[in-house]
Amino acid sequence: MITKKRHLEMALQDVPPHPDPDPDREQYLTPASIAADLVWNATSQGDVEGLKVVDLGCGTGILSLAAALMGAHEVVGVDVDEKAIKMAIRQAQRLQVSARFLTQDVNEFKEKGDTVIMNPPFGAQKASRQEADRRFLEKALKVAPVVYSFHLKKTEEFLEKLVKALDSTITSRFYYSFPLPRIYHFHQEEKREVEVVVLRVEKR
């Protein structure tokens, strides 16, 4: 198990982004610095080490791998994209950690866990995706009693109401400036940043 946050970030630096990202799925890689900080904090709160951690919409696996490096007993990453899952499996082999990656729609995932740590689509690109992160949150709370989930900061007020409606409580918040590199043809800038919040949500 890694004992310094800096070492965790260094271990995650070489996790690659998706080779052929689909704009509808908003397949942005969580930066190593943010992934390390969040999973380090989750571990400090007793939500990772020795537990089963699930990553819904795992992409190439950076959050799953971070949980495995921080001593999770079992890690499961789920993503509908087969290319992303294959890359995640390769990264687990490279880092010599145990993690199980499934090519599956998250809505069809039936297992239970102790903690979900996920970065779902922000719903920032298309109107049809604007409910995506909220659907992920509803699913996550069926999988585990504790959820860490990335969302656009501007949706925070709505999410507070949603969490309450789901009979759950926001116990911690982590704020990040999330860099979005120019990976899609419609992007005008080389890189832009969006303000995100990670909610720690606990089922009542």
Each model region followed by its residue ranges:
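S-adenosylmethionine
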Residues: 104-197
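Conserved SAM-binding strand-loop segment of SAM-dependent methyltransferases
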Residues: 96-106
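Conserved short alpha-helix immediately C-terminal to the canonical SAM/SAH-binding motif I
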Residues: 83-84
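Conserved SAM-binding loop
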Residues: 88
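Conserved glycine-centered beta->alpha loop in an early N-terminal alpha/beta scaffold
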Residues: 57
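Conserved SAM-binding motif I beta-strand of class I
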Residues: 74-79
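S-adenosyl-L-methionine
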Residues: 1-54, 65
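Conserved SAM-binding loop of SAM-dependent methyltransferases across substrates and taxa
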Residues: 60-72
